[in-house]
């Protein structure tokens, strides 16, 4: 039985390092970057490393490396693989589960390739119940026992920026942005207005300039994943703006990415497009509201006006 003290220790992390607000992983160099917001000093980026790992079950019936021990040993040498048998303490359920930890001293991609060379895709049909490989950032936090936002008295100490667009239509192809509102929890408040497309170009560029100047740890909006960010990047395309030139991240070689995401709510799944900017936490506040709705039937709507009244 796990004690309350052990649970608390895990939740808060045993590593004492404070003020980490974001973690980024570089696949090319197998490097971890810790982004810290030091009170009174601002942003600081520090590089770190970790040993990637996978939890693995019994693979003997899956023809792994053709059941050849010699082939597997050669691959282990090639990819710097170490295998450790986990303690199960005679628990039958654990004995039938993921009882091995497989580590690669050469990197995260090498760990994945070790399994693929053995004709076993960790996320394929054969491997999905036998191999669990967490994303590298989660692995780093677990293995180094670090936690985000540790050391802050409360979240007001973390710089947060929220923004909202006003547009002339529902779709970017049919209208334009005529106002961008920006506010932080540190007293910054600005409204950027634009009356034509030339001013709209300048407004979008200025929006990213503000982010680069203030360097908030959290960038939030309401329904921003599928609306505000969609509008910004689509209007960039229509206006001939290269967003990679104006969207400056905290790393000179990384900018932003946009990829499909899923919000799981009990038996429902909602899709959205996640915007990620290196070094920042980009969030859509409506996702938190939708999760709260899933467990609190008194929240009747996710509309912004309703939620504002509900929490006040």
Predicted regions and their residues:
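The two-metal-ion catalytic cores of nucleic-acid processing enzymes
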Residues: 1-312
């Amino acid at each position: 039985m796990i004690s309350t003290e052990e649970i608390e220790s895990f939740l808060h992390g045993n590593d004492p390092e404070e003020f980490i607000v974001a973690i980024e992983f570089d696949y090319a160099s197998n490097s971890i970057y810790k982004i810290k917001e030091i009170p009174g000093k601002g942003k600081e980026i520090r590089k770190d490393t970790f040993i990637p790992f996978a939890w693995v079950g019994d693979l003997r019936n899956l023809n792994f490396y053709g059941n050849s021990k010699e082939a597997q040993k050669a691959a282990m040498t090639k990819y710097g693989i170490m295998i450790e048998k986990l303690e199960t303490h005679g628990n039958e359920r654990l004995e039938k589960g993921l009882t091995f930890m497989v580590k690669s001293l050469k990197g995260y991609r090498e760990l994945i390739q070790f399994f693929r060379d053995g004709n076993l895709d960790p996320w394929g049909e054969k491997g999905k119940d036998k191999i669990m490989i967490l994303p590298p950032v989660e692995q780093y936090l677990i293995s180094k026992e670090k936690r985000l936002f540790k050391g802050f008295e409360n979240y007001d100490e973390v710089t947060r920026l929220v923004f909202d667009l006003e547009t002339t239509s529902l779709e970017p192809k049919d209208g334009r942005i005529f106002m961008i509102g920006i506010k932080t929890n540190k007293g910054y408040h600005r409204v950027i207005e634009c009356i034509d497309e030339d001013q709209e170009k300048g407004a979008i560029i200025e929006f990213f300039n503000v982010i680069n100047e203030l360097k908030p740890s959290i960038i939030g909006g309401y329904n921003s994943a599928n609306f505000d960010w969609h509008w910004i990047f689509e209007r960039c395309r229509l206006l001939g703006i290269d967003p990679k030139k104006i969207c400056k991240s905290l790393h000179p070689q990384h900018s932003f990415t946009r990829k499909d995401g899923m919000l799981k709510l009990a038996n429902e799944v909602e899709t959205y497009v996640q915007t990620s900017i290196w070094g920042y936490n980009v969030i859509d506040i409506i996702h938190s509201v939708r999760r709260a709705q899933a467990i609190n039937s008194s929240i009747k709507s996710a509309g912004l006006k309703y939620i504002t009244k509900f929490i006040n």
